Amino acid sequence: MTEPRLTQLEARRIALAAQGLDRRRPDRAPGARPPGVGDIRKALARTGLLQLDYVTVVGHAHEHVLFSRIGPYDTARLDDIAYRRREFTEQWAREASLVPVAWWPLLGPRRAEFRVRPWGFEATFNQLADYVERVVDEIRERGPLAAEDLDAPEGIERRMPGTWMRSVPRAVLETLFARGRLAVAHRRADRSRAFDLPERIVPDVHHERVLSREDAHRELLRHCARGVGVGTAADIADYVRMPIGDARPRIAELAESGSLEVVHVDGWREPAYLDPSARRPKRVDGCALLSPFDPAIWYRPRLARLFDFDYRFEIFVPEEKRKWGCYALPFLLGERLVARVDLKTERKDGCLRVRAAFLEDGAPRDEVAAELAAELRLLAGWLGLESVAVERRGNLATALRRATRG
């Protein structure tokens, strides 16, 4: 049987609709109700998960993902959904992520496999067995604790210089978390994690549900496919960084059962898989600056296939080797990525600074500048900044500077 065919543009529209980026955010008049918990839930239902990142070049990256979909919202409401209402929980999914609490059993194999393939801290961790159990007992008795609340093991240097874990107590907590013996109760004001027993965080219906490795992977990939809309096996697997060798058989089973539809996308070398419930809009009218960690663009090979857009996040690239800038964000207008801007918040001056602005080939300069200027003003206001300043670098800088002053 011949596979259904999609054009690149049709696939792009499906992908944007799957992420809730196919429509402009509602205009909110001054004094109108800001986006609330319901709006956040709807956006998260589209993305499925948020990859957590607390880099503060332009606010927190994962919070920006929601801003792109619902506009200026109170980030405390996201914390409320995750850490007080317990609708989401932190897990290692796509790196450190916020996932629906119902995904707890789906990530069970990943937690179990951490015991087989642990970090380099494993040898030290095994030597600290008594200390590890005391930590768990202390949390059981005292409630949620962070690394700063714990003493170091006797005779062991507390600090772990040169590692992101920074201290032995933190490394122990993080290892217990990755193995599923602890869960994140909340984030403190400094964004450090406080840990508790998972049975006090995850509802019994999810905590006690145990799935085989195959069933867990299959169900997890089904959720990933909804977020992707249409994509190759690699696109779907990357949504939660699942090894492709584990993902392919389960995706094939989903296709065999009718949970996914095999399609051919023009210009793609591999077959694609379509979520049968995906919306297939005839027209897309998006308008959003996208975080580097946005699910719509985080897998760069797929981004290139869908949008003909070459994107590299250059925050870790030496300055002299950067092409676009330290924190360049793609700008979605309509159904194209039409520009990219290198941004930086300057709290002291109350300014959102555009260090560079680049227009993509064939994009209408004046229209893009006007729409982007409005988006930058909205973003600046959400970040608590008073102004937008555009520097001279980039082929869109002059038009954008003029538009921001208009």
Question: Where do the PLM segments sit?
Answer:
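Long, low-complexity intrinsically disordered regions
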Residues: M1-I297, R302, F309-A328, L333-G406
